[in-house]
Amino acid sequence: LHVGIAAPYVALNPMFSLKETLAFHKQFCPFPLDFKLAEWLDKAGLCAHDDKRLSTFSSGMLQRVRLLLAVANDRPLLLLDEPLSNLDAEGVQFYSELIRSFALSKTIIVGSNYQKDEYSYCTNELLLEKHY
């Protein structure tokens, strides 16, 4: 099964630059033919950082990289755990546009703590509650 996943705890190699990370990922999970990488890096606010090591990125920048890698591929299943973690308002806007552009034809499972923006595009909702 081919799955795209994004979560705050998904590790990225901190010694790689953004450019190296994207090239490495692309070897295993090619981007769709209509995917314009430079355009999406700009929308993510990452264009000026493509030669910088990920170890210099903020938590919000790293989350945008994780989302980009998970969503912008041809995987039929997408798992997103707390996708808005560490994102500012611009990051939330980027997430929404990325989902609308690439993910709506996929099966998406979102783990969320009730942030409607994280799953507003979902057609079904399952509420899991812990009872003591």
Please annotate each region the language model reported.
Residues L1-V10:
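ABC nucleotide-binding domain signature
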Residues Y9, P14-P30:
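Q-loop/switch helix immediately C-terminal to the Walker
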Residues A23, D34-H49:
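Conserved ABC ATPase "signature" region
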Residues R53-G60:
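Conserved ABC ATPase signature
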Residues L67:
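Hydrophobic anchor residue at the start of the ABC signature
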Residues D81, L87-D88:
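ABC-family nucleotide-binding domains
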Residues L98-Y119:
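Conserved catalytic loops of ABC-family nucleotide-binding domains
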